[in-house]
């Protein structure tokens, strides 16, 4: 039997502010369903992803900003970071695991010199403080 993650729910404080942020991040709006007061579902999908995110009203009791350590993988971290910064999104500096082969939680500034998959990353947060890590993964070399 196979399993796949379909949707992750993010707790947010203001649906419209979050919607604008994730659209600026490049996510496509799949659903914006608001059948009654107090209930709204917004679902978005990152480009190229099989998994979506959702947020809204009446979906979760979790506090806004409590979804931490979410990952988005990109084929070129420097290019992705530059594009997001140009769109007005605050993205932390790029860092990489060191040493990669025996990594124990230490980082060095910049991209991994060998551009190994899963070694380089940069962080960002949505307006509520839900955190994301952009991680460089070249699918050609990760296989």
Which residues does each PLM region occupy?
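Hydrophobic alpha-helical segments, principally membrane-spanning helices and signal/leader peptides
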Residues: 11, 61, 110-111
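N-terminal beta-strand motif that seeds the catalytic metal site of vicinal oxygen chelate
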Residues: 1-19, 67-70, 133-143
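Vicinal oxygen chelate
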Residues: 32-33, 72, 81-143
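Core segments of cupin and vicinal oxygen chelate
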Residues: 2-3, 9-51, 79, 86
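Generic signal for short, ordered secondary-structure residues
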Residues: 1, 63, 107-108
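Acidic di-acidic motifs
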Residues: 14, 76, 126
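Conserved short beta-strand elements that form part of the metal-binding/catalytic scaffold
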Residues: 28-67, 74, 92-93, 116-117, ...
